[in-house]
């Protein structure tokens, strides 16, 4: 089944604009790269920028700087490590509360309700007269 479109806008194939240039590709790259930016105003992009965490090389990525130094990355972040985290985690909110108000036994004990809880019936609102 062949679909024929009579729309004049879809029938035309746009030519490559003259502002876009296709740089010469080396034999190591398999795909052509378009360059649409002005020359001499952008920083140099490095394909082999190294990322260091605590003085240890953790990854190689692309970027505008030669090396990056980070404090936390996925290899030592508690979210990615779960219980194997090497970082000291802060006490959760309950532990902070117990540490602060631990001597007050009245608020530390949770009351246990006995028997049935009877809620009073809701009062019906008076109908508005018009």
UniProtKB/Swiss-Prot annotation:
Pfam families attached to this UniProt entry: Ribosomal_L31
Gene Ontology annotations of biological process type: translation
UniProt keyword DNA-binding present: no
One GO CC term, this protein: ribonucleoprotein complex
Assembly and binders: Component of the chloroplast large ribosomal subunit (LSU). Mature 70S chloroplast ribosomes of higher plants consist of a small (30S) and a large (50S) subunit. The 30S small subunit contains 1 molecule of ribosomal RNA (16S rRNA) and 24 different proteins. The 50S large subunit contains 3 rRNA molecules (23S, 5S and 4.5S rRNA) and 33 different proteins.
Family: Belongs to the bacterial ribosomal protein bL31 family. Type A subfamily.
The protein's name in its UniProt record: Large ribosomal subunit protein bL31c
Species per Swiss-Prot/TrEMBL record: Spinacia oleracea (Spinach)
Gene: RPL31
């Amino acid at each position: 089944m062949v679909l024929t479109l009579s729309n004049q806008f879809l029938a035309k194939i746009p030519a490559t604009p003259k502002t876009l240039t296709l740089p010469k590709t080396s034999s190591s790259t398999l795909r052509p790269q378009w360059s649409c930016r002005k020359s001499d105003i952008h920083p140099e992009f490095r394909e082999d920028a190294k990322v260091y965490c605590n003085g240890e090389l953790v990854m190689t990525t692309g970027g505008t700087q030669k090396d990056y130094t980070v404090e936390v990355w996925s290899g030592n972040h508690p979210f990615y490590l779960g219980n194997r985290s090497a970082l000291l985690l802060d006490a959760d909110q309950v532990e902070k509360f117990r540490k602060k108000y631990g001597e007050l036994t009245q608020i530390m004990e949770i009351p246990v309700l006995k028997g049935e809880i009877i809620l009073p019936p809701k009062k019906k609102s008076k109908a508005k007269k018009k």
